[in-house]
């Protein structure tokens, strides 16, 4: 999956995968105990709260960009602490926002992102990959044992292989 490919046809698979990968994340975020929010994660610079903040931001970016707003329009409002007083509710809200823009028409569009132009399909596929990895980070940081969805992992492998091939 090259991020500069803007000719892909929209299909239901990437948004369905993204919604499926967000489900376990919602369950895991809901299970984080109060005393665990500052636990370390595999990302050296992020504790669980910062990691969940990152995911909330990604979901809100999807909503903003696929909803027609520009990076400049939303950059300030999507920086900083997005978890607020209730990170669990903030995650659930961000998930609903992301899901609300996953229509085939919006996925077929081309959007200006921080790295260049991408179709909605490419953008959602990128976010699917990020969320899948972050699910593992949440599990590790919170000590939860949740099995990865085999179909989602299988869907991620060719995307990862294409990315590796693209960078040489």
PLM regions: where:
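Extended, alpha-helix-rich binding/interface surfaces that flank or overlap catalytic cores
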Residues: 51
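Structured surface interface patches that mediate subunit assembly and partner/cofactor docking
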Residues: 2-27, 31-44, 60-93, 97-168
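Glycine-rich loop at the start of a catalytic domain that most often binds anionic cofactors/ligands
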Residues: 54-55
């Amino acid at each position: 999956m090259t991020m500069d490919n803007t000719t892909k046809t929209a299909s239901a698979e990437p948004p369905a995968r993204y919604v499926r990968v967000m489900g376990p994340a919602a369950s895991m975020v809901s299970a984080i105990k109060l005393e665990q929010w500052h636990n370390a994660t595999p990302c050296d610079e992020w504790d669980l709260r910062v990691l969940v903040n990152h995911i909330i931001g990604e979901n809100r970016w999807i909503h903003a960009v696929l909803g027609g707003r520009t990076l400049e329009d939303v950059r300030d409002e999507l920086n900083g602490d997005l978890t607020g007083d209730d990170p669990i509710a903030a995650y659930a809200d961000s998930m609903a926002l992301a899901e609300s823009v996953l229509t085939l028409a919006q996925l077929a569009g081309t959007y200006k992102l921080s790295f260049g132009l991408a179709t909605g399909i490419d953008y959602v596929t990128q976010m699917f990959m990020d969320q899948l990895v972050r699910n593992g980070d949440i599990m590790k940081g919170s000590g939860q044992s949740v099995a990865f969805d085999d179909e989602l992992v299988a869907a991620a492998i060719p995307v990862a292989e294409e990315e590796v091939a693209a960078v040489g």
